[in-house]
Amino acid sequence: MTTPAIISVAITGSVPRKKDCPGLPVTVSEQIESTHAAYEAGAALVHIHVRKPDESPSSDPDLFAQVQEGIRKHCPDMIVQFSTGGRGRSQSERGAMLKHARYGIPRNRIGELSQHDL
């Protein structure tokens, strides 16, 4: 008997930088390319963190939209999960990209919400 499985990848994470791992995909084009390679290898779900030019974490909805567009073009069946994490950012900032999450599953870390966010 074969048990179906979903392979998911988190290609970047929120903490590592290129100084930690030179091959880390941090730009939009690098993230699309890395996601496409994972898709071709069998991954069905990708968890996305976007970065600012200085490689620090970002909640920029436009960056998420660019990554989403590239993934849709090259990996049409892939499930995309945007990270809503964001140390030091408000819940509304961290969730601003959700308007672009039409074809995926957003992730919201309840442990990061404060009483004032609920």
Task: List where the protein language model places each region.
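Histidine-centered catalytic micro-motifs
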Residues: 9, 28, 32-33, 45-55, ...
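Glycine-rich, proline-tolerant flexible connector loops at the mouths of alpha/beta enzymes
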Residues: 19, 44-66
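Active-site beta-loop-alpha junctions enriched in small/polar residues
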Residues: 10-14, 51-53, 83-87, 111-116
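Extended substrate/RNA-proximal surfaces in nucleic-acid metabolism proteins
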Residues: 89-118
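Alpha-helix-loop-beta-strand connector modules within alpha/beta enzyme cores
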Residues: 3, 9, 56-82
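N-terminal small/glycine-rich loop or linker at the start of catalytic domains
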Residues: 1-23
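Structural preference for beta-strand elements that scaffold enzyme active sites
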Residues: 4-10, 45-47, 77-81, 105-110
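Conserved, mostly hydrophobic/aromatic
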Residues: 31, 38, 49, 106-109
